[in-house]
């Protein structure tokens, strides 16, 4: 559990840095090139978990869950897969409610996915 929580926080921090650095400085086209360059560098050093799509997910993590304290608390029970499923929910209130339910009721990521699909449909 501790490793999982640390991984979630690492991904959130990377997302925060990406958001902070790229949103303020880059146009959309430059952002894409920067993501590709950053991804190449990180994949070469640390492996495939830093491919472009993963970096985009990390950035989204910081956007959807902007408070580190909340991420830290949720990460005690939720895996990265839980967070990826929560990204499917556009409505912040619904997303927060589902995250809280996952934590309190111990939903697996599969159970969460099923409940989200019912919400979306």
Can you name each region flagged by the protein language model?
Residues 1-121:
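Basic, low-complexity intrinsically disordered segments
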